[in-house]
Amino acid sequence: MARKTPIERYRNIGISAHIDAGKTTTTERILFYTGVNHKIGEVHDGAATMDWMEQEQERGITITSAATTCFWKGMDMSYPEHRFNIIDTPGHVDFTIEVERSMRVLDGACMVYCAVGGVQPQSETVWRQANKYKVPRLAFVNKMDRTGANFFKVYDQMRLRLKANPVPVVIPIGAEEGFKGVVDLLKMKAIIWDEASQGMKFNYEEIPADLAESAKEWREKMVEAAAEASEELMNKYLEEGDLSEEEIKLGLRTRTIATEIQPMLCGTAFKNKGVQRMLDAVIDYLPSPVDIPPVAGTDEDEAETTRKADDNEKFSALAFKLMTDPFVGQLTFVRVYSGVLSKGDSVYNPVKGKKERIGRIVQMHANERLEVEEIRAGDIAACVGLKDVTTGETLCDPEAIVTLERMVFPEPVIAQAVEPKTKTDQEKMGIALQRLAAEDPSFRVKTDEESGQTIISGMGELHLEIIVDRMKREFGVEANVGKPQVAYRETIRKTVEEAEGKFVRQSGGKGQYGHVVLKIEPNEAGKGIEFVDAIKGGVVPREFIPAVEKGINEAVTQGVLAGYPVVDVKVTLHFGSYHDVDSNELAFKMAAIFGFKEGCKKAGPVILEPMMAVEVETPEDYAGTVMGDLSSRRGMVQGMDDMVGGGKAIKAEVPLSEMFGYSTALRSATQGRATYTMEFKHYSEAPRNVSEAIMAARAK
């Protein structure tokens, strides 16, 4: 089967934004204009095609990034047909992991901002992730029809808060109620959309007289930005004072793909204006799979290697999302980087060391699916029949093994005990939680050995609420949840040169004998536990050293203060002794545990608590109340910014333990007019009175 669309005409893009900037509505309009949807789905009435989990329709927020394919020939049909694979990403801060995951497999992104709210806290998080994966992006300022809409203020905020370099390629005609259309700075014409045809038809008109001067200035800035792409363009611009439409597009495209600039557009998705021009900009400025560097990975011998976006290369793909589907079971969403995959092929998973067979391949259109025979480089699709693949793993040709870089997922910061309402559901709950954990790497499940309770942990209260909710809807298991518990950690502040551990049992017959001397010292934050073997002259025989390390790894699961996991400690084994007959692995493992525990007691142990970056957006009248309340929660207020539509954005760092129930408190303090977002920042030492309270609570 030959390729239907040349790979140069592929665009794998994400649409990403803060909650309520109108991202799902924007995606809906894209599906409408590209001819896939006949009736536009509105989020307001819970009918949007991309929000396909029931919960999303109820809460009006997008949780999972559904992947959809559509085609576009330009708003005036002047382009050859391009194929868009669109990944819709959630904007809520508890789902940052979803955004991170989709960024990894995208070639470009459209950042949607609200013309009234501007650059909101979540927009900054998403921007940082796009920087991390070097994703070229455009900006689309939505909701230009709303009271308080201001395109140029959002432009200033992008520069200030995101350190971005936006280059408007259109400017708005009017704003709020009077928003009519845009001035296309390349053609220097006004684009006015026809409301009766839901924006399918439009006219090019002369630029309104009151905008002529402003349009000229902004065009000048755009041409300058394009000219900086190459010496050739710069020379022509300096000689002639202008560039042709094609040259401007080329210059802007080059710099956008190099992530030096971000073309900026505007419109109102809800009123069907501006999205069509944004689709043209996706073709003009965002990269196809062949415009970006080949994907990097490692081969069987851990040597670095790359895979080009080419059908003739060996097959390689990344599984970036799992979903459980009520009809076909598990769907594994993959992004193909190289080669071709056909139905029935076998693929190899180097992380698990397993070979698996692909059953069916489906391409999603929101949650309708089309079966396809094969997928090629640049495609995004879902495979049915893979049993043992988790998010972030590579699939490749068994004859040409490659591991594409693994994604790194954050550690959960909040935990809750969960139990089924009826005892008979225990097993069903176990299966449901395992499934959900395979889908979402930032969600973990474990059994508490002492109490036998099932503990679930995740990135925030909303995250766990949604998990419990999905258990009920998708698996029919109703559960009771305990009070949220903070995931504290322990570490040390001093170095202990000699921490001795001995395990001796000698009472006739074969005994036990293990003896180690450890140096225990603080490690850099985030480095974890490091074990160093510095034994000289065989005082501890080689074969027992892994047992010592095993002992350390076991000992760090429970700290000496309150039994929380120990982090960021470096342990060096530098001396010890053994007995020819009585020494064995168990004895050395036990000696290491005793030595580590003793050493920690002397090494200035402390409790660490998770600190959260909190940002509250509030009307100015309540700013003082909000800041006072954050301080009373042991928060450090770090700054206050003005927001585009009035009001203040307050940034603070607050311990997670003080943030439970914050949404209710904030609502009542500000009469429901303030909103907040919160994400994990880092662990920091808990003050003494807090540590004592934590220890007392654990001792009960």
Swiss-Prot record:
Q: Which UniProt keywords apply?
A: Cytoplasm, Elongation factor, GTP-binding, Nucleotide-binding, Protein biosynthesis
Cellular localization per UniProt: Cytoplasm
GO molecular function: any one?
GTP binding
| SMART domains (alphabetical) | EFG_C, EFG_IV
Under the heading InterPro entries, the entry gives: EFG_II, EFG_III, EFG_III/V, EFG_IV, EFG_V, EFG_V-like, EFTu-like_2, G_TR_CS
Q: Which GO terms describe its cellular component?
A: cytoplasm
Gene3D superfamilies hit by this protein? 3.30.230.10, 3.30.70.240, Elongation Factor G (Translational Gtpase), domain 3 (3.30.70.870), P-loop containing nucleotide triphosphate hydrolases (3.40.50.300), Translation factors (2.40.30.10)
Positions bound to GTP: 17-24, 88-92, 142-145
Name its GO BP terms in alphabetical order: ribosome disassembly
The answer on whether this UniProt entry bears the keyword Nucleus reads no
Disulfide bridge positions per record: none
Domain tr-type G, residue spans = 8-290
The family this protein is said to belong to: Belongs to the TRAFAC class translation factor GTPase superfamily. Classic translation factor GTPase family. EF-G/EF-2 subfamily.
Reported function: Catalyzes the GTP-dependent ribosomal translocation step during translation elongation. During this step, the ribosome changes from the pre-translocational (PRE) to the post-translocational (POST) state as the newly formed A-site-bound peptidyl-tRNA and P-site-bound deacylated tRNA move to the P and E sites, respectively. Catalyzes the coordinated movement of the two tRNA molecules, the mRNA and conformational changes in the ribosome.
Please report the name of this protein according to its UniProt entry: Elongation factor G
